[in-house]
Design a protein with these regions (language model features):
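Bacterial Sec-dependent N-terminal signal peptides
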Residues: 1-23
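N-terminal beta-rich core of secreted/periplasmic extracellular enzymes
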Residues: 20-204
């Protein structure tokens, strides 16, 4: 019995130790900057940095149906809520690269003035750069998983990352590696299916 308990304890210890290994090696200079920035933030600002709003809230459509950033509305949102990140394209439509540059520049200018920290933009680019006009589209991840081809998964993800970064957006909500074990889940097509091994391999 003692041997079993000892074995379990050692396994738990090994698991805990491996869980604390960072994926990317930390940079002491960057860590120091982060700590300095955190010390300057109020509790309200820290809470705001953990919030995310959709792009639609920062503007409206003009008479031609083209979205624009409303600087008064944006200033009001950022000064009141200190938002840390913004999600997806306005009206769930795909802006051009120039439109993205303009939207982001306008919001960042106000964010830097109000909080001193740039907002992070994220897009649901789960199967290609779907939120940019002229972007490359790929099959949904459930279809990619059906190929059992890791190379296809990797190369389509690389292309998506490249095209997303090309429009000044550093973050995509992909890959979705939660297991699809309930067909009622509304994101079922965005993952790699119900098999944990397949999902882990395709999501590497």
């Amino acid at each position: 019995m003692k041997k079993i308990l000892l074995s379990i304890s050692l396994l738990a210890l090994a698991y805990t130790a491996s869980a604390n290994v960072p994926v990317i090696k930390s940079d002491p200079k960057i860590e120091a900057q982060v700590e300095q920035t955190l010390k300057k933030l109020t509790l309200e600002e820290k809470i705001g940095q953990m919030m995310e709003l959709v792009t639609d809230l920062f503007g409206a459509n003009d008479k031609n149906g083209v979205f624009y950033i409303d600087e008064h509305k944006t200033d009001s949102i950022l000064s009141r809520y200190k938002i840390g990140s913004i999600l997806n394209a306005p009206n769930t439509c795909a802006p051009t690269a120039k439109q993205w540059e303009k939207y982001i520049a306008q919001i960042q200018k106000i964010s830097m003035k109000r909080i001193g920290i740039p907002c992070v933009f994220g897009l649901d680019q789960n199967h290609g750069s779907t939120y940019t006009q002229g972007g490359t589209l790929f099959p949904q991840n459930i279809n990619v998983a059906a190929t059992f081809n890791r190379e296809i998964a990797r190369r389509s993800a690389e292309a998506t990352a490249y095209e997303t970064r090309a429009v000044s957006i550093p973050w995509t909500y992909s890959p979705t590696v939660d297991l699809g074990r309930d067909a009622r889940w509304p994101r079922i097509w965005e993952n790699f299916g119900e098999d944990c091994y397949l999902s882990s391999e395709m999501g590497k």
